[in-house]
Structures are given as structure tokens and as C-alpha cells.
């Protein structure tokens, strides 16, 4: 038999690159502004497709302020992953069982509300990260990695690095601890909860109040100092304030919820028809 010429030899295939496809993470780590749509009522997978068509690169699936069940959320996560939209899920609690299940379902980021101490932040890292950073239970065939079967060490390292743990800052005490939260290894950023923060400050809904604005500024600058992204929640309709925080260093915001978006669209339709009706009635009156 003839020998195989060197140029005909088949080189061993390189191991496939393993990475999380998260446009959200890519944008905010590159200091690019990222609007995020919130889901609380919409349960169909078409939400992810329509959001992508509209230009959103991330969806915030809210388990704290909704009746969405876990099976629905898991399907929404898969729909997001299938169209290249990052699924961000707000946990309903600080529980290990909620946080680990959200991540095992394929979330690119888990947001945890009502975090009140550095000790709680360290506990969250244990729940969200594999060893040596945390104690998250290891399961193979992760949805966010395309259900691939990977060496456990490789999978865990990638997910520790590229899935995000984001505690929320929603009280004056938490604002003062923002630097310490961000200093904890395994914390990937902060989301400011403007509604609860204003309420705790004794100024509910007063987003123009200097007390609220100074608190936001403190957290945004804390993130900028250490290179960890800061998001703003609760003021999606205040583009003037969002522009101010983005200029200061924030990179993402909760920019509109499914209910509000649907209501705004429906209201616009009815307003258009009311205007048409008024013009037609005026024309009829003039014709008499």
C-alpha cells in the first residue's frame, strides 16, 4: 500500500471553543448601553422572537413580581437562547434552590432582590458559582452551552466566568455597602431597584429628588471604579435620567415591561381611531 503524502494527512481536530453566547454580557462589559425588556405576563415563546426582531438583546424574566411558573420560565429561557437573546432571570428569593435552578435552566444572569449585607452576598456566590468560588451542585448538559456533554472542569470554569450573578441594591444601607458587594469575588455587577430604594428613602416615586439621585450616583461610580457593570431598574420611562446615569458609567436598564408595552400600543390604536372619528364627525357637520 502506498504511504499517505504529508499534505493528505488529516490533522487532529481542535477542541471546540466553549463559551456562553450572551450578547448582554458582551455589551455591558464593553461599556455599551443595553436596554432590557421585562417579562411578567407574556408566557409564549414568541416573546423572545419578537424582542429580537425589535432589537432587544436581553430579556428580564421576573419571578419576583409575577405568577410565572418555573416550567414556563425554563421554556422562555430556551426560546431566548435559540434566537441569541440573553435570558436574565430575577429570582423570587435568595434561596439556593431558586438560584441554582434558574442557572441550571439556562439563564445567562441571575438577579437577586433584597440583598442587605455582605454576608448575604457571599452566600449568593456559594449558590451561583461552582467550586472553588461556591458550592453550586454540578450538572452536565447545560442548556446555556447547547446541552453539550463537556468535561466537568471545563464546563464549571466557563459557567463560573461567563454566567452572571447580580445582586440588587434597594435600600440606603445597601447603597453604602455597594463597594463591598462589588469587591466580593463572584459578584458580576449590581442592579439598582429604584422603586424600593425611593420607598426606603421615604420619597416613593420621587426620582428627581437629590437624595435618590445621589444614591444612584454612588453605586454607579462604585461599579465604574472596579469595572463591574451597573444596571438601573424602575425608571424605564425616564430617559432623561437614564441618559444621565449612562453618561456617568451605568450600562444597562430595565427599559419597558410587556404589560406597559402592550398597553401603550393598544392606547395608541384607540387614540388614532378617536382622532379619526372626531375628524369624520367634523366633516359630516360641515357637510350639512
Spans of features found by a protein language model:
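Expand to "…catalyze enediolate/carbanion chemistry for C-C bond making/breaking, isomerization
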Residues: 1-288
